[in-house]
């Protein structure tokens, strides 16, 4: 059995028009995130983690923000593409752990919906998907409600 670990990190600044999409879920909030795609910072971090585990670079390499094809792109489509690259190499997801770092909005009401989206898109058991949220106790750019950061770690296995 071959095992690979991938880590992903992404940040987006508040300021775009709603909706705010996190983990494939519309989260009610007064502003969205500024981005070339739909700005789903969670799915971007997860995509990077998968690509990293497979030694395939990052989402900027696969979906450059200079390419008009990806303007406003649905990040769920990008995530599924990244996961397909891994499955084409014979790997599947063992587990995923995601940390959303945001002072606002409150994420607790949305965690289960995000887990369901991720389980569907990654063809995984929901019990292999963990999503949690934390604040920075009002410190830094997330604490000042200037944006959201997300970290993701994946464990990929090849039987």
Swiss-Prot record:
Keywords attached to this entry: Isoprene biosynthesis, Lyase, Metal-binding
Pfam families assigned to the protein according to its UniProt record, in alphabetical order: YgbB
Coiled coil, from the record: none
Co-factor remark: Binds 1 divalent metal cation per subunit.
Main enzyme class: lyase
PROSITE patterns: ISPF (PS01350)
Role summary: Involved in the biosynthesis of isopentenyl diphosphate (IPP) and dimethylallyl diphosphate (DMAPP), two major building blocks of isoprenoid compounds. Catalyzes the conversion of 4-diphosphocytidyl-2-C-methyl-D-erythritol 2-phosphate (CDP-ME2P) to 2-C-methyl-D-erythritol 2,4-cyclodiphosphate (ME-CPP) with a corresponding release of cytidine 5-monophosphate (CMP).
The protein's name in its UniProt record: 2-C-methyl-D-erythritol 2,4-cyclodiphosphate synthase
